[in-house]
């Protein structure tokens, strides 16, 4: 059964979408009551214009990854092996997991979040908001065929919402 909210193909008979958690047994997609809601369901992550992601390998020294994040004014780096996403390392990881440890002796793979939740470039912005709220995430990688193409951030979503409300 195809989810009417995110387009994910679920197993026949599923009552809840495995991708976004939408109710599949409730008789369809809830209709937006405000034009604002319709835009969130109709606009996709491509509309946010996320730049290409910063990537590092799991073997990258933590201090090098942090320096790259600082230089690019980025909140995270995506961790890849052979161009495939294997993890994410964020500014929050640096503060909560790395602070107080000798960073030159550790690699990003020691502190990254492995196998992060991901989205596709054609997923609705509403799905990103849902996953961030439910999972407590501020950064979600965007992938195409397992290859990272961007990162949607809470900041991106808030800026977009502010523009939408103007």
Which functions belong to the PLM regions below?
Residues 1-166:
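Tandem CBS (Cystathionine beta-synthase) repeat/Bateman regulatory domains
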